[in-house]
């Protein structure tokens, strides 16, 4: 099996900050090395944290911080195992949904069981990022070991299609923002080119530039 994004020990603080503070039961799909569990449990030691991790090595690392770890793909859990994850106050998909064959089915499956006050916190790569647009413009589309062109990505999302992913599965995006890295800001010529393309296609130029700045989208969705 092809290895997913290389493990690291740096938590996604934007995801951490979107987890409702009162969450007593959390399920994280793709718990990797367990660093998000580590950081959340520093603040909320009484939380019961379940990790689901498809990679055996990462699953073992997750056990350092998670109360329970399932070595499995969330897409392959049978009904008994899936039902055992409920109730949960928050589900986390930090750089995971893009790796799934059918993220729509996974979200619908959660929606059919989730309580009204629960949340989903997700981080998804932005295929509309200016670097992607620039590379596609010159015919450069080469898969890599990590990043926007991670070779294990199966799905691609813009801000609008990310919102549609949740809306079409019974959720609505309650809050969120783009992850913008200052060292990856586009130059004036790139910005102008994005504005020109937006205007040529009848889109809002300012929105197009703003959407191109986000490397990833980090959002919290709730049942609609």
For each of these PLM feature ranges, what is it?
Residues 1-90, 104-107, 138, 177-219, ...:
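Conserved N-terminal segment of class I S-adenosyl-L-methionine
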Residues 75, 97, 128:
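Adenine-nucleotide cofactor-binding loop residues
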Residues 89-101:
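A short SAM/SAH-binding and catalytic strip from SAM-dependent methyltransferases
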Residues 101-105, 132:
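Short N-terminal helix/helix-N-cap motif within the alpha/beta-hydrolase-1
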Residues 104-119:
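A short glycine-rich, Lys/Arg-flanked "PGG" loop and its adjoining helix->strand segment in the class I
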Residues 122-143:
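Conserved class I S-adenosyl-L-methionine
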Residues 144-161:
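Acceptor-substrate binding/catalytic loop of class I
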Residues 162-177:
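A SAM-dependent methyltransferase catalytic signature shared across enzymes that methylate proteins
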């Amino acid at each position: 099996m092809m290895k997913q994004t290389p493990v690291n020990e740096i938590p996604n603080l934007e995801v951490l900050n979107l987890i409702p503070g009162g969450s007593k039961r959390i399920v994280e799909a793709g718990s990797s090395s367990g660093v998000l569990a580590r950081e959340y449990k520093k603040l909320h030691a009484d939380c019961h944290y379940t990790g689901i991790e498809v990679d055996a090595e990462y699953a073992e690392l997750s056990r350092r911080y998670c109360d329970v770890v399932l070595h499995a793909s969330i897409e392959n859990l049978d009904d008994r195992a899936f039902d055992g994850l409920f109730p949960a106050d928050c589900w986390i998909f930090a750089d995971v949904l893009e790796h799934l064959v059918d993220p729509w089915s996974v979200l619908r499956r959660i929606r059919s069981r989730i309580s009204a006050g629960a949340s989903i916190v997700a981080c998804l790569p932005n295929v509309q990022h200016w670097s992607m647009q620039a590379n596609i413009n010159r015919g450069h589309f080469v898969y890599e070991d990590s990043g926007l062109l991670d070779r294990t990505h199966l799905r691609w999302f813009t801000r609008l299609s990310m919102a549609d992913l949740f809306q079409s599965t019974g959720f609505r995006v309650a809050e969120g923002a783009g992850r913008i890295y200052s060292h990856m800001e586009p130059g004036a010529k790139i910005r102008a080119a994005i504005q020109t393309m937006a205007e040529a296609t009848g889109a809002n130029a300012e929105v197009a530039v703003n959407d191109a700045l986000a490397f990833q989208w980090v959002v919290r969705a709730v049942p609609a």
